[in-house]
UniProtKB/Swiss-Prot annotation:
Its main location: cytoplasm. It is an enzyme of class 2 (transferase). It comes from the Bacteria. It is found in: Cytoplasm. GO terms for cellular component: cytoplasm. This is 2-dehydro-3-deoxyphosphooctonate aldolase. It catalyses: D-arabinose 5-phosphate + phosphoenolpyruvate + H2O = 3-deoxy-alpha-D-manno-2-octulosonate-8-phosphate + phosphate. One of its GO terms (molecular function) is 3-deoxy-8-phosphooctulonate synthase activity. NCBIfam families: KDO8P_synth (TIGR01362), PRK05198.1 (NF003543). SUPFAM superfamilies: Aldolase. It comes from Albidiferax ferrireducens (strain ATCC BAA-621 / DSM 15236 / T118) (Rhodoferax ferrireducens). Belongs to the KdsA family. GO terms for biological process: keto-3-deoxy-D-manno-octulosonic acid biosynthetic process. Keywords: Cytoplasm, Lipopolysaccharide biosynthesis, Transferase.
C-alpha cells in the first residue's frame, strides 16, 4: 500500500503514527511533532503525526474534548505546513469528512464505529487513506467484513481499493480492562490490508478512573515489542511530554523523552522479524 509517499506492508520497514491524544495547544503540537520528526528521521522511520480535534467518546461529559474542528484543523494545518509531516486525525460523523479531508493526509475511524456501515462507506469514499480501528468488541476475523465494505464503497466511486489499514487496539476483557491477543495481528492479515497495532490504547483501562480512563503505560513497550515480533506494517502510539498532565489518555501515553529508546529497540526487532519472511501459512493444517 502506498501511504503518504512511502510503501507500507510486511515486506517494508515499520512505520509510525504518533502524537498527543488530543490537541491541547498549538505549541504542544508543534513541539511534539518537531521532536518526533527529528527522532524518526534519524532512525529512518516513516512518520505520520496524529492528534484529535475532538474526543467524542470521553468517559464523562465534563472532561476536555479538544479545541473543536475549526481551530483543531488550523493547528494541524500549521504542523503540516511548517514541519512538512503528513497528518492523521480521526472523524466521528459523516458531516466532518469533507472538511477534515481537505486538510489532513490520512483519516481514522474510531473503534466504536467500525460496524457503522454508512459511516465506513462515507469515509472510504473520501479518497484518502483510512486507518480503520477494530472495535474492542470485534473478533479479528470480522475485520475482513469491515475492510470489504470500505473497498466496495471505494470501488463504486472509481477510487483506490487498496487505501485502507486495519488497526488492532485490544479487546474488552471483563469490565474496565482490555487485553491484546497477538494472534489477531496474524488473523487480520486475511483482510488483505496492512495491519497496524495501537500500542497505547491497548493498555487503556476504559472508564477505570470513574470519570476518565486509566491505563498501564508501563506495558506499552511490552506490547509494542510483542506486536513487532509477530510482524506488523506499522505502530500507532500516543505520546506526551508530561503524561501526568495530559488532558486525555495520559495514563497510557508514552513519555516523549522515552520515545527514541523505545523506537530504537522496535526498529531493530522489526528488521529481524521481517528478514526471512513469515512461516505461519506453511504451518497451517
Amino acid at each position: 500500500m502506498k501511504l503518504c509517499g512511502f510503501e507500507v506492508g510486511l515486506n517494508q520497514p515499520l512505520f509510525l503514527i504518533a502524537g498527543p491524544c488530543v490537541i491541547e495547544s498549538e505549541q504542544l503540537q508543534m513541539d511534539t511533532a518537531g521532536t518526533l520528526k527529528e527522532i524518526t528521521a534519524s532512525l529512518g522511520i516513516a512518520f505520520i503525526f496524529k492528534s484529535s480535534f475532538d474526543k467524542a467518546n470521553r468517559s464523562s461529559g465534563s472532561t476536555f474534548r479538544g479545541p473543536g474542528i475549526e481551530r483543531g484543523l488550523e493547528i494541524l494545518a500549521k504542523v503540516k505546513r511548517e514541519l512538512g509531516v503528513p497528518i492523521l486525525t480521526d472523524i466521528h460523523s459523516e458531516d466532518q469528512i469533507a472538511q477534515v479531508a481537505s486538510v489532513v493526509d490520512v483519516l481514522q475511524t474510531p473503534a466504536f464505529l467500525c460496524r457503522q456501515t454508512d459511516f465506513i462507506r462515507a469515509v472510504a469514499q473520501s479518497g484518502l487513506p483510512v486507518n480503520i480501528k477494530k472495535g474492542q468488541f470485534l473478533a479479528p476475523g470480522d475485520m475482513k467484513n469491515v475492510i470489504d465494505k470500505a473497498r466496495a464503497a471505494a470501488r463504486e466511486k472509481g477510487l483506490n481499493e487498496d487505501n485502507f489499514m486495519a488497526c488492532e487496539r485490544g479487546v474488552s476483557f471483563g469490565y474496565n480492562n482490555l487485553v491484546s491477543d497477538m494472534r489477531s495481528l496474524a488473523i487480520m492479515r486475511d483482510t488483505g490490508a496492512p495491519v497496524v497495532f495501537d500500542a497505547t490504547h491497548s493498555v487503556q483501562l476504559p472508564g477505570g478512573q470513574g470519570t476518565s480512563s486509566g491505563g498501564q503505560r508501563e506495558m506499552v513497550p511490552v506490547l509494542a515489542r510483542a506486536a513487532v515480533a509477530v510482524g506488523v506494517a506499522g505502530l500507532f502510539m500516543e505520546t506526551h511530554p508530561d503524561p501526568s498532565k495530559a488532558l486525555s489518555d495520559g495514563p497510557n501515553a508514552v513519555p516523549l523523552k522515552h520515545m527514541r529508546a523505545l523506537l530504537e529497540t522496535l526498529v531493530a526487532l522489526d528488521a529481524v522479524t521481517k528478514k526471512n519472511g513469515f512461516l505461519e501459512n506453511s504451518f497451517a493444517a
